[in-house]
Amino acid sequence: VENSLPAAVDQQQEWKDAMTRRFHSRSVVTGEISLPAVPSLLDEYVEMCSRIFAAVGRKFNDEELAHLRTVLQNQLAEAYSISQRSNIVISYNAPVGPTLHYQVNARWFTVAEAYENWISTREPPLFGTEPDARVWALANEAADVRDHRVLDIGAGTGRNALPLARRGHPVDVVELTPKFAEIIRTQARQEGLDLRVIVRNVFETTDDLRQDYQLILLSEVVPDFRSPQQLRRLFELAAACLAPGGQLVFNTFLPRYGYEIDDAAREFGQQAYTGMFSRQELATGVEGLPLELVADDSVYEYEQANLPSGAWPPTSWYADWVSGLDVFPVAREQSPIEMRWLVFRKTR
């Protein structure tokens, strides 16, 4: 009897496990998983689905997982190629029984649509109330503001463009989002400001831009760039449109501590408004053009030190975002990336 006891206990457990599997298969399951489209994290999507499906009693075999992987791979590639504001939505349902049905679909906004959604769903001010301290300091270098023309690319709600125009600078704005453009245009018209608004992608043409700007600025715009080629096009535009001695200022995320940006970080960063470039990509982008780097500052440190009293941080999310914490949720001093203010001067 003693020798047969372990076998009897094992048999009891087998029967219990079989009953539990049947119990799980009597569940009726419906669910949806929505995640940013990051193709290089394909394994994470497969693993998440595998765990969830198994937890509701529909464990996939190797063949089923391989098929799921292929479906996810194709949808991820499509979604990410269309927009860096894209999601993968995995809808699943299981009737009574062992079968689980699923669908994988891509959903996306254009960048302009994403920001228009901000207008309808978020309380203003969307980006803060004060102009960037770095931009304001450069504008203050002007001997005569009337001759110090400014081009603000991706001006948003006009946080920089409107104060610069009030200060007396002639300002041109190129804005991709129609609702943002209308906000700026309406305010400029009401105040009688010397401010022109152009609604389009800035890289479509330079025909309607001047070639004598003293300052070209992009605040919180370059993180939406998708490739080093766009960075190169920005430098080419600046070289063509700045007057000699004029300056280009923009902020972008750059690595720290020798961090090497991989595809997963680059893709997820773009989904989190945190597109990043390497120092080498920056150097390659400006190579051969009459532009020299004259300033390179931490956005966090510069803005914290130089914004008016009470204006730091500009928004509740700003300090963490410029520190890279929307991608790497670690202590700020340990983040492998940070947003930097870069200033380039046209040499000839």
Residues covered by each model-derived region:
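Short glycine-dipeptide loop
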Residues: 242-248
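A short beta-strand submotif of the Rossmann-like class I SAM-dependent methyltransferase core
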Residues: 218-221
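A short, conserved alpha-helix within the catalytic core of class I
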Residues: 225-237
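Conserved class I S-adenosyl-L-methionine
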Residues: 146-156
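Class I (Rossmann-like) S-adenosyl-L-methionine-dependent methyltransferase catalytic domain
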Residues: 1-142, 157-163, 167, 174-191, ...
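A short acidic, Gly/Pro-enriched loop at the edge of an enzyme's catalytic core
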Residues: 207-216
